[in-house]
């Protein structure tokens, strides 16, 4: 398993046939917490590595609350 400096790291989608993962991660940079949703690819020699595809937002109570509300809305629409 690869070593990261992530405070939180969770696979939220995986396609083993294509060697792809999407991960939700949280890390700190210059004393600011960031939340990432990023695509990873399977390297032949180093395990899964991040791509440039994804999004990163400052992790604040407000941004996490908005993300949570959006996910709740999506879930309620699928029922």
Where do the protein language model's features map onto the residues?
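Negatively charged, low-complexity tracts enriched in Asp/Glu with abundant Ser/Thr
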Residues: 1-20
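Low-complexity, intrinsically disordered regions enriched in charged/polar residues
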Residues: 5-6, 23, 31, 61, ...
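Generic structural "secondary-structure junction" signal
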Residues: 13-14, 26-31, 59
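Mixed-charge, Lys/Arg-enriched low-complexity segments
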Residues: 53-79
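Weak global preference for isoleucine
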Residues: 7, 11-12, 37, 57, ...
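A short, structured beta-strand/loop element
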Residues: 22-53
């Amino acid at each position: 398993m690869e070593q990261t400096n992530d405070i939180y790291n969770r696979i939220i989608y995986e396609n083993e046939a294509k060697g792809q993962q999407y991960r939700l991660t949280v890390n700190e940079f210059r004393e600011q917490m960031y939340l990432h949703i990023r695509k990873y690819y399977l390297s032949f020699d180093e395990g899964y590595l991040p791509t440039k595809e994804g999004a990163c937002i400052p992790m604040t109570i407000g941004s996490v609350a908005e993300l949570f509300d959006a996910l709740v809305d999506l879930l309620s629409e699928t029922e």
